[in-house]
Regions:
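Short alpha-helical segment immediately N-terminal to, or the first helix within
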Residues: 6, 67-74, 108-109
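Hydrophobic transmembrane alpha-helices and their membrane-interface caps
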Residues: 13-65, 152
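Residue-level signature of transmembrane alpha-helical entry/exit and packing/kink sites
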Residues: 15, 19, 47, 80, ...
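Helix-loop junctions and hydrophobic alpha-helical segments within the transmembrane domains
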Residues: 72-95
Length: 161
């Protein structure tokens, strides 16, 4: 569903693939940590974490992608567009990510229910991982796949829509 929404919003075939891949990478990193630590998770953890972290991270990714597209439409080259998108969206991504972290970490610390504490710990860590991945990896994906994005997106550079 997220793939289709991104595809319709950006009128692109490649952007949903790139954004969902970056988001899923952040989720996999988050879920891999307890595995490698040998920590057991509640049976619903992967479903809950996948859904909530996906929802939070897609906002960060859409924010940066929208700004990147706007800068490309203004005629900026890919490096300048990525740099501006990165600088302008980073404060919002960081404040949103840290707020999400603080809320879930607070619940994890004070929850008396083990399942809630465990899931909120994963969500808190996922907020930080997602924030870092969108800030560091998504701009690199824009740099690598700029030509593909421009060719597989309708009106990405400001042409016909």
């Amino acid at each position: 569903a997220i793939f289709i929404i991104i595809m319709l919003i950006f009128k692109s075939i490649s952007l949903p693939i790139i954004l969902v891949a970056v988001i899923e990478f952040a989720i996999m990193v988050n879920m891999a940590i307890p595995f490698y630590q040998g920590t057991s998770l509640p049976f619903v953890a992967s479903i809950v974490i996948g859904a909530i972290q996906l929802g939070a991270t897609v906002d960060y990714a859409i924010l940066m992608t929208t700004r990147y597209q706007k800068e490309r439409q203004r005629g900026r080259d890919k490096m300048e567009a990525i740099s501006i998108a990165h600088k302008t969206s980073m404060p919002s991504i960081i404040s949103s990510g840290l707020s999400f972290f603080a809320a879930t970490f607070g619940v994890a610390c004070y929850s008396q229910v083990e399942m809630i504490g465990s899931i909120c710990t994963l969500l808190a860590r996922g907020a930080i991982i997602s924030m870092v991945v969108v800030i560091l990896i998504l701009p690199a994906m824009f740099m690598i796949f700029d030509k593909v994005i421009c060719k597989t997106s309708i009106g990405f550079l400001g042409g016909k829509k």
